């Protein structure tokens, strides 16, 4: 895709899938078939126990490894949690923050998301901050209002000189596991709105530079059509990111010029 002002980012989210040994096998297969001369950024966000194996396997490549969550605290009595310093030391470049599953299953709030975004930036990580609306919110006509609030609260305190390091991922929660499908036009409408919010919060220059991803079941079959939209700069990929061949096809779609 022709992105004059910003990077195209293809980010995989493995969720709770694959063991460290399976991770090593996956990375070996992926390296063998990665397209040559790719220019889009590729991130693979994996379970915490898989991070060391992923980092070791991809050390000599341009693929960035990321985590699926972090804690905003630097250290302390937080059993089961992982700090941003731990992720950085382990070799992570990215971290997903505020995924819809974290918000729904574990009660993460916009304040939690904001604290994690600030901690990630402080640690030198690239936060992939998620936002999105439910079916009820969409049917009530409050998509723009809800997502605008998520972005404002999630980015609170992020200085202008760091906003370009943030990646925003739009998840149409209403179209995930519901049998409904978000069209490329519907996805573009929201991503364009997200960019306008960033423009109002920061500047037109920063809004043009920030990467906005689509996180609604992008796969090797629909990637090109979605990525052809002017305000969709990549994808946060779920199930398709677990298959090396599908990852490569999505990367190839991102590398194709649009008409």
Where are these regions (language model features)?
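Active-site loop-to-helix "anion-binding N-cap" substructures in soluble metabolic enzymes
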Residues: 1-259
């Amino acid at each position: 895709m022709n992105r004059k002002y910003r990077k195209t980012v293809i980010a995989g989210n493995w969720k709770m899938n694959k063991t460290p040994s399976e991770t090593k096998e996956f990375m070996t297969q992926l390296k063998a078939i990665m397209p040559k001369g790719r220019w889009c950024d590729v991130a693979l966000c994996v379970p915490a126990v898989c991070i060391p194996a992923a980092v070791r396997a991809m050390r000599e490549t341009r693929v960035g490894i990321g985590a699926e969550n972090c804690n905003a605290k630097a250290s302390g009595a937080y059993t089961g949690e992982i700090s941003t310093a731990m992720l950085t030391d382990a070799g992570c470049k990215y971290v997903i923050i505020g995924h819809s599953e974290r918000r729904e299953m574990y009660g993460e709030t916009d304040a939690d998301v904001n604290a994690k975004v600030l901690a990630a930036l402080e640690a030198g990580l690239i936060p992939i901050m998620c936002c999105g609306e439910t079916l009820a919110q969409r049917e009530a006509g409050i998509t723009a209002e809800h997502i605008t609030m998520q972005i404002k609260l999630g980015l609170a305190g992020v200085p202008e000189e760091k906003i370009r390091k943030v990646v925003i991922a739009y998840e149409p929660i209403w179209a995930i596991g519901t049998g409904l499908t978000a069209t490329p036009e519907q996805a573009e409408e929201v991503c364009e709105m997200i960019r306008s919010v960033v423009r109002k919060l920061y500047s037109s220059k920063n809004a043009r530079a920030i990467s906005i991803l689509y996180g609604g079941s992008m796969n090797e079959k629909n990637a090109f059509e979605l990525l052809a939209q002017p305000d969709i700069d990549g994808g946060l990929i779920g199930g398709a990111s677990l298959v090396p061949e599908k990852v490569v096809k999505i990367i190839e779609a991102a590398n194709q010029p649009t008409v």
